[in-house]
Structures are given as structure tokens and as C-alpha cells.
């Protein structure tokens, strides 16, 4: 069994309040869950109105599958309007 953990740091430049940021983050996390069947949560910068850190986890029996899945998630996030990906890190357990 392989567990992949992806940490993504995002900027939400158009956000003017925590409510604006949370709306963007909720929408993105719901789309990731539905499209890629991964677990997603906001894990840092909870009180910052322009920054968000998402944690994404995937579990499978094959390392190559988990690597590909998390790369698709990164590509998807990069294409999203309204957010700028500042950094990301991946680790496998």
C-alpha cells in the first residue's frame, strides 16, 4: 500500500476577506474530491485572507498510480482561475 501526500500552497489574489477565500477554497476542494477521488483539506493559513495551504492524500497499491494521480491534481490546480500556486511538495509513505 502506498500513501501519497501532496501539500499545495496557494494565493487567492482576488480575495478581499476570509469569506471570499473560503468560497474559492471550498469550491476547489469539492472539485478535487469529485474529479480525482482524493482526500482534501485546508491545513494552514486558515486565518489569512489571501493564502491557503491544501493537503491532498491518495492511497493505492501502486506507487506509479499515486504519483500520476497527484501530478494530475497539481496540473488541475495550476489551471484554475482565481488561484496562483506558490509551491507544492509531495511525499510517499
Locate each region found by the language model.
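A generic structural signal for short beta-strands and their flanking turns/coil linkers
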Residues: 2-8, 34-36, 50-54, 84-86
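Short, charge-patterned binding micro-sites
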Residues: 3, 41-62, 91
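Short glycine-/aliphatic-rich beta-strand segments at the starts of folded cytosolic domains
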Residues: 4-13, 18
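Amphipathic alpha-helical assembly/interaction segments
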Residues: 11, 27, 31-44, 67
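C-terminal binding/interaction regions
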Residues: 21
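Conserved alpha-helical elements of sugar-nucleotide-dependent glycosyltransferases
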Residues: 24
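C-terminal structural segments of small proteins and small subunits
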Residues: 58-93
Amino acid at each position: 500500500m502506498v500513501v501519497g501526500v501532496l501539500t499545495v500552497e496557494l494565493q487567492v489574489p482576488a480575495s478581499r476577506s476570509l469569506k471570499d477565500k473560503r468560497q474559492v477554497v471550498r469550491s476547489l476542494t469539492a472539485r478535487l474530491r469529485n474529479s480525482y477521488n482524493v482526500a482534501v483539506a485546508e491545513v494552514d493559513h486558515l486565518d489569512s485572507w489571501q493564502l491557503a495551504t491544501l493537503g491532498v492524500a491518495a492511497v493505492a497499491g501502486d506507487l506509479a498510480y499515486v504519483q500520476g494521480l497527484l501530478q494530475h491534481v497539481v496540473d488541475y490546480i495550476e489551471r484554475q482561475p482565481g488561484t496562483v500556486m506558490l509551491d507544492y511538495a509531495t511525499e510517499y509513505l
